[in-house]
Design a protein with these regions (language model features):
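Bacterial N-terminal signal peptides that target proteins for export
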Residues: 1-10
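A residue-level marker of the well-folded mature domains of exported/periplasmic proteins
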Residues: 25-381
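C-terminal motif of bacterial Sec signal peptides marking the signal peptidase cleavage site
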Residues: 18-22
Length: 381
């Protein structure tokens, strides 16, 4: 599979003072991330559990992107076995030099396999990979690699197309609101696939986007959702890492298709479906590879058909005929008969993006920098 992104996102602007929490899979003792110590021994003694570290950009307490990664960590512990691995995670790590400090501390604590789960960790992980060739590094949603560093992602756009179909069928106002973090290819793929899916069942729809310039900022997400509702949106979705958009939809009596996690707990009436990410099987696979000395630095871009992303808890607020059509399209995506970015596709400025009968190849997907027809506005610089 091809590697994912090709453009570097601006780092999320987060407070300079923050609390870092580290926990293992056997307890919940909290501690502040320590300053780096002298380099630890790089070889794990025979029969000792493999130490595996996870670095998170947001708290695991909030349903969303980081929560799904932690569910994946727990899945891996269950599948691989507590006798074989010990896992540690640090949450609320910003995409700054603090990420390097936290990862270096993990290395000094003896972790031999480290998963960095946010795009902005990429350069720090690559730097450390060169310094510590006996440690294996896995970076989510990035594109840089090294002999001991690879990257992994999910083809979110496949699920986004299907979610867009449901939103297009459910909307009454024909305005759908999309809260987005940074205008990088991964996010634009999602916006565009969602819009194409919505237009396939409802050509009248418009998708309006508000950019937060942050992966995790609940107040910004709330304000953005309120702005979109004020602009006429009656269905919302998001690419950010919080549950705030779902909560705002619930409070306003609107509909929402949350991304990352099922958010029925915060939006019991508003949620009409949930686009859920499943990282667990990948984590279990790569941890087992490391244990068996078969780890590979092969970039992976996982598909819908692999169960890496799924639409769950579809509400009866979505017309039955739209759900039926969505299931048919899902089957075609899984079989390879249909690709969300098969032409003809035009940008919202009327330019040809994909010719009729052609399918956008991966090297074009990972450099996407435009909106398709149906999205309102211009992509910010």
């Amino acid at each position: 599979m091809r590697m994912s992104l090709k453009l570097v996102a601006a780092a999320a602007a987060l407070a300079s003072v923050f609390a870092l929490t580290a926990c293992d899979d056997k307890g919940s003792t909290a501690k502040k991330a320590e300053e780096p110590k002298a380099a630890a021994e790089t070889k794990t003694a025979a029969n000792e559990p493999l130490k595996v570290g996870f670095v998170y950009v947001a708290p695991i307490a909030d349903v969303g992107y980081t929560k799904q990664h932690d569910i994946g960590r727990l899945y891996a512990i269950d599948k691989v076995g507590k006798d074989k691995i010990t896992t540690t995670f640090v949450e609320n790590v910003p995409e700054t030099a603090d990420a390097e400090r936290v990862i270096r501390q993990m290395i000094n604590d003896g972790n031999k396999l480290i998963f960095g789960t946010s795009f902005g960790y990429m350069n720090y992980m690559q730097k450390l990979a060169k310094e510590y060739p006996d440690v294996k590094f896995e970076h989510a949603t990035g594109y840089k690699s090294a002999p001991n560093m690879t990257n992994y992602n999910i083809r979110f756009y496949e699920g986004r197309y299907l979610a867009g179909m449901l939103a297009g069928g459910a909307t009454k106002s024909n305005v759908i609101g999309y809260v987005a973090p940074f205008p990088i290819p991964e996010v634009l793929q999602g916006i565009n696939a969602f819009t194409l899916g919505a237009k396939s069942v409802n050509p009248k729809i418009q998708v309006k986007v508000v950019w937060t310039n942050a992966w995790y900022d609940p107040p910004k997400d709330t304000d953005s959702a309120k702005t979109l509702i004020g602009q006429g949106a009656d269905v919302l979705t998001q690419h950010t890492n919080t549950s705030a958009v779902a909560s705002a939809a619930e409070a306003a009596g609107k509909m929402v298709i949350p991304y990352n996690s099922d958010m029925k707990s915060v939006a019991p009436n508003a949620q009409i479906a949930a686009l859920v990410l499943n990282w667990g099987p990948y984590y279990a696979k790569k941890i087992n590879q490391a244990l068996e000395n078969k780890w590979e630095n092969k970039p992976v871009w996982m598909h819908l058909k692999e169960g890496a992303i799924s639409l769950e808890n579809i509400s009866d607020k979505v017309p039955a005929d739209v759900v039926k059509k969505m299931e048919e399209v899902k089957a075609k995506i899984n079989s390879g008969e249909f690709h969300p970015f098969t032409g003809p596709i035009k940008t919202n400025e009327g330019k040809e993006a994909v010719k009729a009968g052609e399918t956008l190849p991966d090297d074009k997907l990972v450099t996407m920098n435009y909106y398709v027809d149906g999205v309102v506005g211009k992509v910010p610089n």
